[in-house]
Amino acid sequence: MVDTVIPGDMACLDADLLQLQEMSSFVLNSKPGFTQKLFDQWLSLPEAQRQVGSLLKDAVAGAPINVTGSASGSNSATIPSMFPAGSAPPLSPRSCGSPRTTKQRAPSNLGSTLKVVNEPVKEPIPQFYFQNGRPPPSEIKEQCMFRINHFFYGHMDGLQIQEFKLVTREICKLPSFFSTSLFRKIDLNNTGFVTRDAFIDFWVNGNMLIMDTTTQIFKILKQKDQSFIVKDDFKPLLKELLATHPGLEFLQSTPEFQERYAETVTYRIFYYINRSGNGRITFRELKRGNLIDAMLHADEEEDINKVLRYFSYEHFYVIYCKFWELDTDHDFLIDKENLMRYGNHALTYRIVDRIFSQVARKFTNKVEGKMGYEDFVYFILAEEDKSSVPSLEYWFKCIDLDANGIITRNEMQFFYEEQLHRMECMAQEAVLFEDILCQMIDMIGPENESHITLHDLKGSKLSGNVFNILFNLNKFMAFETRDPFLIRQERENPTLTDWDRFAHREYIRLSMEEDVEDASNGSAEVWDESSLEAPF
């Protein structure tokens, strides 16, 4: 053989390349020794060496390698000396180390020409990502544009805030008291006008048009650089509600109570919606809650007291008056002794201590040993609506003395001991702890009877009674005697919550007391603003 250096990829023998029609490639591959000798014999031929050398030079120089041959006859695929003269095996287009060469090839003719493979037709990929969401269908967009043109017709300079209310309600389908918040969201430069183009850019081009109502409201309420809603975000909303809702017109002469009403509504919203308790309502929390439905209801209902969720003035009145009754020095703060008087001294000292230790919720008021109005709103909602999840979480933290996530027998006994002592002092028939423990276990049906978890409480409709047994004597006794008045109330209005029933009873009581006081004074005189008492 000639002393020719053959690259590794070319030195590898592939039986298919020999193109022997007398023998199949399968036979050649099964006898590698014989095949190698055959290959060596061919490579020793001068003609083969010249052809291989020429191809190597072309390959090194980067020139295209052309291999020609004919497949017209049965002997045309043979190699020099062993095959007819003038034909040569083609070089493998890939190395023998390629995984593809492990696949068995069918014999091919040396003279076959390469087939031209047409490139696939390039089809444009439709856009699948939109920064502001997928744009609305053309039909919906056209309908919206027609309505926009109608409302902005004749207003070349744009609409002012009062004129913008119809746009908010008729085009955006949002509660009318969102008008100010939406207006300011669009009028970033505070010009006092929203032009047609500015509204289209925000509502149509920003794809607000096709978002669901919850997403629209969330984007309008939150600040631009935030991903959550805070209490201050509700201020313009509630200010407009107070200024425009027919059921709240009577408060316009008492701005201090307008402010208290707005605060109370906000606290109630965060109590029920902000489940994380961090003062920041996320989109997920907003979507899971019932605030949007309540807002839509408030916009449609002229009697604000029929909007029981969050916005009822009667509910605000009850909360504020209950706080005012306890705040004897009217500094808008209450201490432990003040709270002990709540519900006609219904609560135990031990539970009040736990409330003021702030294990259930950190007080927003920073005065040591004092509870502010916001803290009281959370307390009264938890106390009077023990069927709700926020209430169960509130009281669970109070009873769970070691904060280990379970309420044990010893922890329940610790709180019940004071209840037992109070019953004895009142000459009431005392119920032993062992008996009441069995009753509580039966009511909850915990997974493990040695302790009660928050999950156990959430799975039972009678969980509120367990807390009443442990620290509210009046409600415990009412439960033991099965107060027929309470049972009748529940049957008459099964859709109402415990809080709804409580607020209704208390409002009637407070109204009657107000009427008696007015009658004793001889006339219903105008409320003295300096007294900071409720107007009625």
From Swiss-Prot:
<feature type="binding site">
    <location>
        <position position="402"/>
    </location>
    <ligand>
        <name>Ca(2+)</name>
    </ligand>
</feature>
<dbReference type="Pfam" id="PF17958">
    <property type="entry name" value="EF-hand_13"/>
</dbReference>
<keyword id="KW-0106">Calcium</keyword>
<comment type="subunit">
    <text>PP2A consists of a common heterodimeric core enzyme, composed of a 36 kDa catalytic subunit (subunit C) and a 65 kDa constant regulatory subunit (PR65 or subunit A), that associates with a variety of regulatory subunits. Proteins that associate with the core dimer include three families of regulatory subunits B (the R2/B/PR55/B55, R3/B''/PR72/PR130/PR59 and R5/B'/B56 families) and cell signaling molecules.</text>
</comment>
<feature type="domain" description="EF-hand 2">
    <location>
        <begin position="261"/>
        <end position="296"/>
    </location>
</feature>
<dbReference type="Pfam" id="PF13499">
    <property type="entry name" value="EF-hand_7"/>
</dbReference>
<feature type="binding site">
    <location>
        <position position="411"/>
    </location>
    <ligand>
        <name>Ca(2+)</name>
    </ligand>
</feature>
<dbReference type="GO" id="GO:0005509">
    <property type="term" value="F:calcium ion binding"/>
</dbReference>
<feature type="region of interest" description="Disordered">
    <location>
        <begin position="69"/>
        <end position="108"/>
    </location>
</feature>
<dbReference type="InterPro" id="IPR041534">
    <property type="entry name" value="EF-hand_13"/>
</dbReference>
<dbReference type="InterPro" id="IPR018247">
    <property type="entry name" value="EF_Hand_1_Ca_BS"/>
</dbReference>
<keyword id="KW-0677">Repeat</keyword>
<feature type="binding site">
    <location>
        <position position="400"/>
    </location>
    <ligand>
        <name>Ca(2+)</name>
    </ligand>
</feature>
<feature type="region of interest" description="Disordered">
    <location>
        <begin position="517"/>
        <end position="536"/>
    </location>
</feature>
<keyword id="KW-0963">Cytoplasm</keyword>
<feature type="compositionally biased region" description="Acidic residues">
    <location>
        <begin position="526"/>
        <end position="536"/>
    </location>
</feature>
<dbReference type="InterPro" id="IPR011992">
    <property type="entry name" value="EF-hand-dom_pair"/>
</dbReference>
<keyword id="KW-0479">Metal-binding</keyword>
<feature type="domain" description="EF-hand 3">
    <location>
        <begin position="387"/>
        <end position="422"/>
    </location>
</feature>
<dbReference type="GO" id="GO:0005634">
    <property type="term" value="C:nucleus"/>
</dbReference>
<feature type="compositionally biased region" description="Polar residues">
    <location>
        <begin position="69"/>
        <end position="79"/>
    </location>
</feature>
<feature type="domain" description="EF-hand 1">
    <location>
        <begin position="174"/>
        <end position="209"/>
    </location>
</feature>
<comment type="function">
    <text>Probable regulatory subunit of type 2A protein phosphatase.</text>
</comment>
<feature type="compositionally biased region" description="Polar residues">
    <location>
        <begin position="98"/>
        <end position="108"/>
    </location>
</feature>
<dbReference type="InterPro" id="IPR002048">
    <property type="entry name" value="EF_hand_dom"/>
</dbReference>
<keyword id="KW-0539">Nucleus</keyword>
<dbReference type="GO" id="GO:0005737">
    <property type="term" value="C:cytoplasm"/>
</dbReference>
<feature type="binding site">
    <location>
        <position position="404"/>
    </location>
    <ligand>
        <name>Ca(2+)</name>
    </ligand>
</feature>
<protein>
    <recommendedName>
        <fullName>Probable serine/threonine protein phosphatase 2A regulatory subunit B''gamma</fullName>
    </recommendedName>
</protein>
